[in-house]
């Protein structure tokens, strides 16, 4: 499912002394099946744009087309329930939204709210729990007895239980340790392919953008200031610095190496790309000497 913004402006509390313009002339398409990263410094408009992705907010002017549905400033809220089933949002710290007595009931709540029978919803709950890598023995447990990482996966299972076509991830690894963050991001990558999802990732983690995204949207002061592939976005450190953004760690290290004489035809985004570029520049017998030294 594609999402297209056309000449979208959004203003909070229009016509009041507290009027604040948050989005200006947004024109962009998130393609079906893509993995799009949305980046920008705090206050750039990311969260406001995110809430337009399933019409939690409606544009003050312009249109947002979600699949075949066109959202305008006058679209009635009562017509949006089914649409929101198709665009699932995993908000920051989603485990804080858990509330039911058992894991099964919490995951099943969404499907039942959209008309599924209790039996079908509980069956879906078991399937979604397995999908996020948790054992079915947890179904009868209270979600509040689980570890923080397990609680987050249960909350994500609840979003997936709605069978969304678009999965929006708002800082999904916030508060996790490095291994937990890696496991979570690998899970989303797997789900994207297994469920044929369109994924939108809102993050401050440039490494995750480099490793997982196909497309990047950069926001600043309520406007889209650049779009492109991760390689296109991260090729200009000075531009990123001017917009209060950083580089992936691997790319930053490559820039340091360049100052010491190393050459790169294109900036590496991943550790594997960096390693390959370094090996190409080593003397012909260097790797053999390293192997002999290790022995």
Curated annotation (Swiss-Prot):
Its EC number is 7.-.-.-. Residues 3-246 form the ABC transporter domain. GO terms for cellular component: ATP-binding cassette (ABC) transporter complex. Keywords: ATP-binding, Cell membrane, Membrane, Nucleotide-binding, Translocase, Transport. It is an enzyme of class 7 (translocase). It is a peripheral membrane protein. One of its GO terms (molecular function) is ATP binding. It is found in: Cell membrane. Its main location: membrane. ATP binds at residues 40-47. PROSITE patterns: ABC_TRANSPORTER_1, ABC_TRANSPORTER_2, CBIO. ATP-binding (A) component of a common energy-coupling factor (ECF) ABC-transporter complex. Unlike classic ABC transporters this ECF transporter provides the energy necessary to transport a number of different substrates. Forms a stable energy-coupling factor (ECF) transporter complex composed of 2 membrane-embedded substrate-binding proteins (S component), 2 ATP-binding proteins (A component) and 2 transmembrane proteins (T component). Belongs to the ABC transporter superfamily. Energy-coupling factor EcfA family. This is Energy-coupling factor transporter ATP-binding protein EcfA2. It comes from Lactiplantibacillus plantarum (strain ATCC BAA-793 / NCIMB 8826 / WCFS1).
